[in-house]
Design a protein with these regions (language model features):
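Sequence/fold signature of self-assembling virion shell proteins
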Residues: 76, 80-83, 163-291
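Acidic/polar, low-complexity extended loops/arms that serve as protein-protein interfaces
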Residues: 1-144, 160, 168-172, 178, ...
Length: 291
């Protein structure tokens, strides 16, 4: 979704953006010009946003005996589970309303005002009104193109079976084709069932490594702490309970385990990423849904 970049060895990626909305006074629209007449010179207002690497990481361990005796190999299963679970964590962080900082990017709903959902009498009327409410700000901003719906799969199922009083299912074929009102749909269980989200993906920019970086060690020492999971919903392990083995004051973390001494193996995954919206107000949120 959106425009994707790669950090490579760059510590920051600067992406130009337009400061003024389209059709604002002083924009760069062309004008009809008569023969021999001077062509107008207009000035636009442009700025930039920056993408900087935010590191996701996790470590998991297993014993030497498990490595030697498991079929299929436990390391492969752990790598697969890390990728699956991290994908869910990324979706959760992407779709929340938490502000960004030096540790993590801001969620798409950060700073977005929630539009109250419709209280119409039928499900079809509620769905139609909620979609219209989500779309209206984009129409006002002349930006009602390259949009994508974000919905929970359970809501997509309900839309398929929502019918009019005469037995017509207006959304069934659309959902089956992967769109609503001609706009593509992304279904994710990380979208709350009470939410309908609409994003202008043309303004969504991101940088994510093509593949996670995995490293193996059997000699490291680790502080065995899960970083506050599952209560650390902000995904900021740095603000939770994972500690240096020995801090600046000489205080040792606990519990600490030596992989070499316990004949164990650790798998570490690292993944750099960042995302942002190039223009403000290019995300709308309707909630709480009543269908």
């Amino acid at each position: 979704m959106g425009i994707r970049f790669s950090f490579g060895r760059n510590g920051v990626i600067k992406i130009p953006r337009r400061n003024r909305p389209r059709n604002a006074p002083g924009d760069l629209r062309g004008a009809f010009v008569g023969e021999g007449a001077p062509i107008p010179v207009r000035r636009g207002s442009f700025g930039s946003i920056s993408l900087t690497p935010h590191k996701m990481g996790v470590i998991s361990t297993f014993s030497r005996e498990m490595a030697n005796q498991s079929t299929p190999q436990i390391e492969g299963l752990i790598r697969e589970a890390i990728v699956e679970d991290t994908a869910e964590a990324i979706d959760q962080a992407l779709l929340d309303a938490i502000a960004g900082d030096t540790i993590r990017p801001a969620g798409l709903l950060n700073g977005v005002s929630t539009t109250p959902a419709s209280a119409a009498s039928t499900s079809v009327d509620k769905i139609t009104a909620d979609m219209a409410a989500a779309l209206a700000p984009f129409i006002t901003a002349n930006a009602a193109d390259r949009l994508v719906w974000l919905i929970n799969p359970s809501n997509a199922f309900k839309m398929q079976w929502a019918s009019t009083t005469v037995g017509v299912y207006p959304f069934r074929d659309q959902i089956a084709a992967g769109n609503i009102a001609g706009l593509p749909v992304i279904q994710s269980t990380m979208v709350p069932t009470t939410s309908l989200i609409l994003v202008r993906y043309a303004d969504f920019v991101s940088s994510v490594a093509d593949t996670p970086e995995f490293d193996i060690s059997d000699v490291a020492s680790i502080h065995e702490d899960d970083g506050g999971y599952p209560t650390d919903q902000a995904m900021r392990a740095g603000t939770a309970t994972v500690l240096p083995l020995v801090d600046a004051a000489g205080v040792a973390a606990k519990p600490v385990r030596s992989l070499w001494q316990t004949a164990s193996i650790g798998v570490r995954m690292l993944l750099d990423m960042d995302w942002a919206m190039r223009r403000a107000s290019m995300v709308t949120h309707v909630s709480p849904l009543a269908w």
